Amino acid sequence: MKKLLFASDYQEGAHPKIIQRLAETNLMQSFGYGMDEICESARERIRAACGCREAEVHFLVGGTQTNATVIDALLQSYEGVIAPDSGHVSLHEAGAIEAGGHKVLTIPHEFGKISAKAVEEYCKEYEQDLNHEHMVKPGMVYISQPTEYGTIYSLKELEALSRVCRENNLPLYVDGARLAYALACKQNDVSLKDLARLCDVFYIGGTKCGAMLGEAVVIPKPGRIPHFFTIIKQHGGLMAKGRILGIQFDVLFENKLYETIGQGALAAADKIRACLAASDYMLDFDSPTNQIFVSLNDSEVKLLAECVEFSFWEKLDSGRTVVRLATSWATSDEDVERLTEVLKKMESSLDGSGEQQ
């Protein structure tokens, strides 16, 4: 039997409406590098959704390129970026930020999030250190919505972070690789308009949220990053056939598709969580979006790996392993049903100690 793929949320292609629009416009001639009419239409739709008519909107090819480009553009050579120690730029971008000449200044996370208080304390400690001229200066703050742990910042938390960042002259940058799943979450109270109001730069994820590829960077205040187009090209994030990206975001922001596309993923994740709880598996913590983290013993990991592709997350001091299961906008009811059947069979094949009978 073919393995079930729950390792990530970018294992499918693109939403059918995007494929249809790409096919319809395939032979259309247009200007390059995002200067075409479709990209401009997408920009206008995004500006309207963000309630920010003057915002700059730039289309880049992928998440790591986007983070590396934005962070390098916002920082001076002597500055680093404050980020949670669990952040994507901290762990899973192969040193892309450091390769660009900037240090990632990590703060301990709490379920993927960092607080305004922690950022404020970091800045105070830097200033109070008499040797701070010999140190990397904190120059901006990076967070993601949702976080790497699938948790989300509340509006109150984001407002507090924004306030501390502005008090300390630190640009606030939000990585929205999975933003559609936060927007679709029932517990979420942060809108695109809130992001535009509270952040200096943020990006709207496409790759993990229904697009074939691509991310849309939003800079609410035009001119905040001078010559950003050129900087994008320097970092290899600019597509000559830019309309390929524009078409996808034009579709995603037509009739509010982006704000609803994550609903199916969240419903699927909730079904999986319910099955795990009913079968007495140990959820590592509560994540309200499309990522599920479950703690397994070695026997359970081995059995699950026979039928399901999942992501290793971390090894606990207890010897148990935390694995991640991720749903996406395209996760089918059939695959969810098959996964729950696998989980139930695993439970029945193990004795009370969690070992295989």
Language-model segments: what does each one mean?
Residues 153-185:
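Catalytic PLP-binding core of fold-type I/II PLP enzymes
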Residues 111, 137-138, 144, 152, ...:
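Active-site C-terminal subdomain of aminotransferase-like
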Residues 73-91, 120:
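Conserved PLP-anchoring active-site segment centered on the Schiff-base-forming lysine
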Residues 101-139, 143-146, 153-160:
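PLP-dependent aminotransferase-class I/II
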